[in-house]
Amino acid sequence: MPETTHRIPALDGYPLAARLLVPDGAPKAVVQVNGGTAILKEFYGSFARFLVQNSYAACLWDYRGTGESAPASLRGFSARMLDWGTLDMPAVLDFLEETFPDLPK
């Protein structure tokens, strides 16, 4: 199961940490795993491995300000849930569209 790490630019350019897991054969589709409120991407590792074992690619990622998408210090850092939904989620989907243009999302 190939796994790669990525820095996906959000729609405003903020870098988002992501892990892309792909089955050994051709994937049927790709799943964007949007975590629960401030839940780190690693929490969904077992789910992603299950998807890959069933021929789906999976993208795990951290919202801005959380996990590996957090700056070294959160002092003075501003991230709103609105940013997660309007700037972060669509950028990850764009990345998946570019990476897997012919697969369902």
Label the model's feature ranges:
Residues 24-25, 54, 99:
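Alpha-helix C-cap/termination motif
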Residues 36, 62, 88:
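Conserved acidic functional residues
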Residues 25-28, 33-39:
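Active-site glycine-rich loops that stabilize anionic/oxyanionic intermediates
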Residues 43, 78-99:
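Alpha/beta-hydrolase active-site loop
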Residues 7, 33, 83:
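Conserved beta-strand positions that form and line the central face of beta-propeller blades
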Residues 1-25:
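N-terminal cap/lid segment of alpha/beta-hydrolase-fold proteins
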Residues 100-105:
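Alpha/beta-hydrolase fold nucleophile elbow
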Residues 43-74:
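Conserved alpha/beta-hydrolase
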